[in-house]
């Protein structure tokens, strides 16, 4: 939770779009996503839908491909990932995925201020988690993340590391927990998820 709280203080700028999709066509496809992720990609904790505004287009596209192929969202304990799979499967082909990713990349990244809640974190992939902990102490744990995600959490396409600054803390906490226990990153084709698992496992417990 300390490292999650520290990530919540980061202010890395969004990476430049790299997919030349048709954002206007993607806008139509995105209508399916609005109910959970919001009209501007702001997310909805009550629906366990993360903020997607501010994520790089190439990362959005990769996750949609992974959901569609069952690389992500197929683990029996990945409740919310399983909910995403049929949504991704409504996108007919690579072009449709690129289009919606390009549209999402037009959203304002906004900011996600550090939470002041101090409710005990829930287990992986069950309910939305609230986080507590010291951002300053989390800075030490974040040192291992810097080489890929950057000092300010801006991400690095060359290293296939997404932007994490501005993301909601409850979602970051859940994903770290999911990576740690193998709910995420255990599929044989999830190359980058497999790279994240040992990083998450460095965190000794929910308070780390």
Each model region followed by its residue ranges:
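The canonical Cys-X-X-Cys-His
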Residues: 3, 7, 26, 31-40, ...
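Electrostatic cytochrome c docking/interface patches
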Residues: 8-30, 45-48, 108-142, 157-160
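Residue-level marker of structural boundaries
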Residues: 9-12, 57, 69, 93, ...
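Axial heme c-ligation environment in periplasmic c-type cytochrome domains
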Residues: 1-4, 15-21, 45-51, 68-107, ...
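Sequence context surrounding c-type heme c attachment/ligation sites in exported
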Residues: 27-34, 54-58, 62, 68, ...
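Periodic glycine anchor positions in long extracellular repeat architectures
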Residues: 26, 38-43, 54, 70, ...
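Consensus positions within tandem repeat domains that build extended binding/scaffold surfaces
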Residues: 40, 63-66, 103, 175
């Amino acid at each position: 939770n300390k490292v999650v709280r520290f990530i919540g203080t980061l202010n890395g700028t969004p990476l430049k779009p790299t997919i030349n999709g048709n954002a206007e066509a993607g806008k139509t496809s995105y209508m399916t996503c609005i109910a959970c992720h919001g009209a501007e990609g702001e997310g909805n904790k009550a629906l366990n839908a993360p903020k997607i505004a501010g994520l790089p287009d190439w990362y959005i596209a990769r996750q949609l491909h992974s959901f569609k192929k069952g690389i992500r969202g197929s683990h029996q304990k990945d409740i919310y990932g399983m909910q995403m799979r049929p949504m991704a499967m409504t996108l007919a082909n690579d072009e449709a995925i690129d289009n919606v990713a390009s549209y999402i990349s037009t959203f304002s990244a906004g900011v996600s201020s550090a939470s002041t809640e101090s409710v005990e974190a829930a287990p992986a992939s069950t309910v939305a988690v609230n986080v507590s902990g010291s951002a300053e102490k989390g800075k030490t744990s974040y040192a291992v993340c810097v080489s890929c995600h950057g000092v300010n959490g801006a991400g690095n396409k060359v290293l296939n590391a997404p932007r994490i600054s501005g993301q909601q803390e409850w979602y970051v906490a859940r994903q770290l927990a999911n990576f740690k226990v193998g709910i995420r990153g255990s599929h044989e084709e999830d190359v980058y998820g497999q790279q994240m698992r040992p990083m998450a496992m460095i965190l000794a417990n929910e308070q780390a």
